[in-house]
C-alpha cells in the first residue's frame, strides 16, 4: 500500500509540473508518410538474430565466426560474420560482441540480454544516474554502469573495425536488458562520431525525457521493436520519470509463432506513448522471450525466474503501473 501511495504522490506532483515533452511526443502514426517496408521487416528479423546470438557469443574469441548452436542465427552464420571484439563485465555481468559482416558491409555491436530479467522486474529498482550526454540527462543506474564497464573495449573494437573497413555502416542491437544497454551504447558511440543504427527488441525504458529526446534526435535510425503485451518495455514506469526512444514498432499480439507482415506492424511515435505496448497490462513472459523466434535458446543455461513474488502478485503490480502510466499520459494531453 505504501508503494502505491508513493506512486500516486509522484503522479500528483508530475501533474502539477510542466511536462512539454509529453504534449509534444504523444501521437500514434498508423498511417505515417514513411511506413514499415519489406526491407524494414527483413532488417528486424536479421538484427534480431544478432541480438539472439549475443546470448552465446559474448565471449567468443576474436577471429572466430558468430555461431549459434541452437540454429537461431542462420542468416548471420550464412554471412560469415566474424567477431572482432568481445567483452564480459565482471561487476555488472553485461556481455557483448563486435562483429564485421563483409556480405552486408557493416560493423555490428550486439549486447546480451539478461538471463535474470524476471529478477530485475521483481526488484523494482528504478533509480537514475546523471549522464553527460546532454544537460538534464538521466539514465537508469544499472544500464549506465553496465555500459561504462564495457565501453572502452567496445569503442576500441569499433574503432579498429572502422579503420579496417572505412565504408562499412554501423548497427547496434540487443534484446531485453541488452536492448537497454545497446541504447546507451548507441547514444555514446554516436556522440563519438560513429553513426550507429539502433535495433532493440523488448527493451525497457532507459532514461528520462532529456535522454530519450537526445537519442531520438541523433544521427542514426531507431527501430525499437515491441511484442504484444511484453511487460518489460512498460518498465520502468512513465510515472517514475522514464521515457522511451521513438518511434516504436509494435508486433501486435497474435500467436507466438505468427509470421508478421508489414501491414501488421503498428508504428507509434512519442517518448511517452501508450498507444502500442504501453497500453497493455499484465505479466506475459512468453511475449518477452518470443520476437519472431524464441530468444536465448543458445544461452548456456535456461532463463531462471526469481520467485520472491508470485506471478499473480507481479501481474497485479505490473497492471497497476501500466494503468497509472496510461492515466498520467491522459492527464497530460
From Swiss-Prot:
Positions annotated as active site in the UniProt record: 176, 230, 288
Induction description: Shows a low basal expression, but is highly inducible by lipase substrates such as olive oil, and repressed by glucose. During plant infection, transcripts are detected 4, 8, and 10 days after infection.
CDD domains cross-referenced by the UniProt entry: Lipase_3 (cd00519)
EC number(s) per entry: 3.1.1.-
Subcellular location: Secreted
Temperature-dependence annotation: Optimum temperature is 37 degrees Celsius.
UniProt keyword annotations, A-Z: Disulfide bond, Hydrolase, Lipid degradation, Lipid metabolism, Metal-binding, Secreted, Signal, Virulence
Leader sequence segment: 1-16
InterPro entries: AB_hydrolase_fold, Fungal_lipase-type, Sec_MonoDiacylglyc_Lipase
A cellular-component GO term for this protein: extracellular region
Reaction catalyzed: a monoacylglycerol + H2O = glycerol + a fatty acid + H(+); a diacylglycerol + H2O = a monoacylglycerol + a fatty acid + H(+)
Record-level GO BP terms: lipid catabolic process
GO MF, any single term: metal ion binding
Disulfide bonds: 56-268, 276-298
pH-linked activity: Optimum pH is 8.0.
Annotated PANTHER family: ALPHA/BETA-HYDROLASES SUPERFAMILY PROTEIN, FUNGAL LIPASE-LIKE DOMAIN-CONTAINING PROTEIN
Function: Secreted mono- and diacylglycerol lipase that allows the use of hydrolyzed lipids as carbon source and might play a role in pathogenicity. Shows lipolytic activity towards olive oil and p-nitrophenylpalmitate.
Family according to the record: Belongs to the AB hydrolase superfamily. Lipase family. Class 3 subfamily.
Protein name, UniProt field: Secreted mono- and diacylglycerol lipase 1
Species per Swiss-Prot/TrEMBL record: Fusarium solani (Filamentous fungus)
Amino acid at each position: 500500500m505504501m508503494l502505491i501511495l508513493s506512486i500516486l504522490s509522484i503522479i500528483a506532483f508530475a501533474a502539477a509540473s510542466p511536462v512539454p515533452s509529453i504534449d509534444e511526443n504523444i501521437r500514434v502514426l498508423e498511417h505515417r508518410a514513411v511506413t514499415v517496408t519489406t526491407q524494414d521487416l527483413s532488417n528486424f528479423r536479421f538484427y534480431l538474430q544478432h541480438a539472439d546470438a549475443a546470448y552465446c557469443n559474448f565471449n567468443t574469441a576474436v577471429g572466430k565466426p558468430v555461431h549459434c548452436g541452437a540454429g537461431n542465427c542462420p542468416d548471420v552464420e550464412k554471412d560469415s560474420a566474424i567477431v572482432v571484439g568481445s567483452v564480459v563485465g565482471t561487476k555488472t555481468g553485461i556481455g557483448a560482441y563486435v562483429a564485421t559482416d563483409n556480405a552486408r558491409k557493416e560493423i555490428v555491436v550486439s549486447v546480451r540480454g539478461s538471463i535474470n530479467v524476471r529478477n530485475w522486474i521483481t526488484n523494482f529498482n528504478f533509480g537514475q544516474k546523471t549522464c553527460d550526454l546532454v544537460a538534464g540527462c538521466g539514465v537508469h543506474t544499472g544500464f549506465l554502469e553496465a555500459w561504462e564497464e564495457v565501453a572502452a573495449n567496445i569503442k576500441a573494437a569499433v574503432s579498429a573495425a572502422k579503420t579496417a573497413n572505412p565504408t562499412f555502416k554501423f548497427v547496434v542491437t540487443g534484446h531485453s536488458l541488452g536492448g537497454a544497454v545497446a541504447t546507451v551504447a548507441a547514444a555514446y558511440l554516436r556522440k563519438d562520431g560513429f553513426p550507429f543504427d539502433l535495433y532493440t527488441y523488448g527493451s525497457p525504458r532507459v532514461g528520462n525525457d532529456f535522454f530519450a529526446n537526445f537519442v531520438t534526435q541523433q544521427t542514426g535510425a531507431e527501430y525499437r521493436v515491441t511484442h504484444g503485451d511484453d511487460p518489460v518495455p512498460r518498465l520502468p514506469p512513465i510515472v517514475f520519470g522514464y521515457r522511451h526512444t521513438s518511434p516504436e514498432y509494435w508486433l501486435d499480439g497474435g500467436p507466438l509463432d505468427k509470421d508478421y507482415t508489414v501491414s501488421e506492424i503498428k508504428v507509434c511515435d512519442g517518448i511517452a506513448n501508450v498507444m502500442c505496448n504501453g497500453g497493455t497490462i499484465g505479466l506475459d513472459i512468453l511475449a518477452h522471450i518470443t520476437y519472431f523466434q524464441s530468444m536465448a535458446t543458445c544461452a548456456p543455461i535456461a532463463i531462471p525466474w526469481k520467485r520472491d513474488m508470485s506471478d499473480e502478485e507481479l501481474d497485479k503490480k505490473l497492471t497497476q503501473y501500466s494503468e497509472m502510466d496510461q492515466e498520467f499520459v491522459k492527464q497530460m494531453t
